[in-house]
Amino acid sequence: IFMSQQYPFQCNIAQALNIIGDKWSLLILHGIMSGHQTYKEIYNSLEGQIASNLLSSRLKALEADGLISSDLYQKHPPRYRYTLTPAGEDLNIVFNSLVLWGEKHLTTCYKRLIHKNCNHTVETHYYCPHCQQTVAEDQLAVVAAEEKEHQHE
């Protein structure tokens, strides 16, 4: 929505980036996920680094794209509380993956993703609910969506 050009590719990554790939959207969503629900709280969570008109337009676009919902909690002046929709909540795994990637590859690591019980870093794994098994990375394949129906069981 915000990029001057949209990715035209028939690719989940490209189409997801068309929705959340601008400079601010993921940070706004992460702020909401972290409990910052009002405009002022979201703005402050971004340390005032975003122009207010840009934040307003991003919030409207994220709502139009079905990632957040708004609830009017004050009429004069109108003020909204923002919450994640189920589609927005599904980005939590993306945020966690970015934290893990950052811990491994950034020169300065700011956050870690840990298991609360033992305080050690976790790893990501893939699970097949059909087979009820953890799946190794070398056993994964990305296939065209229509091919999903033709896979053997």
Feature annotation, model-predicted:
Residues 100-153:
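C-terminal regulatory/oligomerization modules of transcriptional regulators
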Residues 26, 65, 94-105:
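Alpha-helical linker/hinge and terminal dimerization helices associated
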Residues 46-70:
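Canonical helix-turn-helix DNA-binding module
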Residues 21, 74-96:
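Basic, amphipathic "hinge/linker" alpha-helix immediately C-terminal to the N-terminal HTH DNA-binding motif
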Residues 13-54:
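N-terminal helix-turn-helix DNA-binding core of bacterial DNA-binding proteins
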Residues 40, 60, 80:
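Residues within the helices of the helix-turn-helix
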Residues 2-17:
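Short, Lys/Arg-enriched N-terminal segment that forms or immediately precedes the first helix
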